[in-house]
Amino acid sequence: MTLLALKEDRPTPKAVYNWRVYTCAAIASFASCMIGYDSAFIGTTLALPSFTKEFDFASYTPGALALLQSNIVSVYQAGAFFGCLFAYATSYFLGRRKSLIAFSVVFIIGAAIMLAADGQGRGIDPIIAGRVLAGIGVGGASNMVPIYISELAPPAVRGRLVGIYELGWQIGGLVGFWINYGVNTTMAPTRSQWLIPFAVQLIPAGLLFLGSFWIPESPRWLYANGKREEAMKVLCWIRNLEPTDRYIVQEVSFIDADLERYTRQVGNGFWKPFLSLKQRKVQWRFFLGGMLFFWQNGSGINAINYYSPTVFRSIGITGTDTGFLTTGIFGVVKMVLTIIWLLWLVDLVGRRRILFIGAAGGSLCMWFIGAYIKIADPGSNKAEDAKLTSGGIAAIFFFYLWTAFYTPSWNGTPWVINSEMFDQNTRSLGQASAAANNWFWNFIISRFTPQMFIKMEYGVYFFFASLMLLSIVFIYFFLPETKSIPLEAMDRLFEIKPVQNANKNLMAELNFDRNPEREESSSLDDKDRVTQTENAV
């Protein structure tokens, strides 16, 4: 098996894997660059000497300062939570593409408002207000982009294409982690020093806004809304095939069958998917989607993203430049491992297996770091020039090892699974629910991490280590492997028990349905579909 080998659900023309589908995914993923940058830059910006001086952080007690910092960080997640819910409405009425335009505009307005903050008259309030709006923008985008990409993607590369969304997150995070190291080492601690990191937010948002005018609407959304002629044109453009090509004919028939089934079972309309929540199978998938983000945030990732100076100080790293440098290296490691996950792991190794490995390895690393802090108490050394002990160096090694386990597993895989596990009629609502869960747990972590470090110290690491172990049990018993399964077959996947064998059994069913003998018997049906397609266009 080669590095980029693909496991196809049916014979697929090479033309399907073309630059158009990758380019559309990349443009939509400017949204994740926004999210990654905002998640990464804020923690180190709050530690910039120019920022702490302008807003007089020295006048606060430790508890009051922790509360202020957590509020600045967490209002963004609160806005994102509601942005996810708003996205369900915009997705239904406006479509995927126009929703991306709308949420990029909201983000741009929020980022611009933040630039009005100062240490005198306006104070820090514009930053808080702007981060609420920016949060609404990224919350909506975090809902929309995985859906949009999954609906464009051929099944064999769906994980890889949704993974571009995760790659964009890491590119934004990499810039966010390093930018404050750059301004801190090259600029005087003036107002301009901290304004630059806030202003950079406008770049990915502007690129998403402009790019969204070029990318097409999701063909699945167009079919669901009765715009068949436009949908056919978009689908043929994305697949780089003619309307009469057998692959296009089959894909249209799959989409039509899926829409017909859910029109019959759930019904069309804005409120109909809410009524489908009465069904146990739908409730179960919503629960699974939300729990994936509970376990993801339970790994400790967002405590590190938002409060990296605090995290590294607890290990024994002192000095602003050193803390920023260590944070920047953390961003580089995440970026490299995300590329490995994107190109190989997610579509070849599968979703379940990499979640197992990531949780087990990450938990061991957290146990070691917590034990080191309990025994050595490195945080008690307040000297700026304090050197790391051999135990501290080992703790740093295990921190980066934890990053190596977490990044190619829990970082992006929950987004991939949630983008593909819901049916057409509940996909927007399901993704909204999953993304809202992500931002809810994100909010909890960002709001209480400073207080947790004050009260629990080393216990914070034991807490995250325990949650990672529990996630293994949950995934093993409750989550089926979704790799290579067509979106139209997801319902069947979640019906098969036990979940450990569901993917294997369903792929065998799909291959049986499409074996040569059955293909011959269905050839007349395909000819009829070709004729119908020709008439449609």
From Swiss-Prot:
Entry-linked SUPFAM superfamilies: MFS general substrate transporter
Keywords carried by this UniProt record: Glycoprotein, Membrane, Quinate metabolism, Transmembrane, Transmembrane helix, Transport
Cellular location(s): Membrane
Principal location: membrane
Record-linked InterPro entries: MFS_dom, MFS_sugar_transport-like, MFS_Sugar_Transporters, MFS_trans_sf, Sugar/inositol_transpt, Sugar_transporter_CS
GO molecular function per UniProt: carbohydrate:proton symporter activity
Residues on Cytoplasmic side: 1-26, 96-98, 153-160, 217-285, 350-352, 411-435, 480-537
Disordered: region residues: 514-537
Protein topology in the membrane: Multi-pass membrane protein
Role this protein plays: MFS-type transporter; part of the qa gene cluster that mediates the catabolism of quinic acid (QA) and as such, allows the use of QA as a sole carbon source. Involved in the upatke of QA. The qa cluster encodes 3 inducible enymes (qa-2, qa-3 and qa-4) catalyzing the first three reactions in the catabolism of quinic acid to protocatechuic acid (also known as 3,4-Dihydroxybenzoic acid).
Basic and acidic residues compositional bias, start-end: 514-531
Entry's family note: Belongs to the major facilitator superfamily. Sugar transporter (TC 2.A.1.1) family.
Segments traversing the membrane: 27-47, 75-95, 99-119, 132-152, 161-181, 196-216, 286-306, 328-349, 353-373, 390-410, 436-456, 459-479
Phenotype upon loss of function: Impairs growth on quinic acid as a sole carbon source and leads to very low inducible levels of qa-2 and qa-3 enzyme activities.
UniProt-listed NCBIfam families: SP
Extracellular side of membrane: 48-74, 120-131, 182-195, 307-327, 374-389, 457-458
Glycosylated residues in this chain: 184
This protein's name: MFS-type transporter qa-x
Reported induction: Expression is induced in the presence of quinic acid. The quinic acid (qa) gene cluster is subject to two levels of gene control: a primary system which responds to the presence of quinic acid via the qa-1S repressor protein that blocks the qa-1F activator, and a secondary system which represses transcription of qa genes in the presence of a preferred carbon source such as glucose.
Origin species: Neurospora crassa (strain ATCC 24698 / 74-OR23-1A / CBS 708.71 / DSM 1257 / FGSC 987)
GO biological process: carbohydrate transport; quinate metabolic process
Cellular component per GO, a single term: membrane
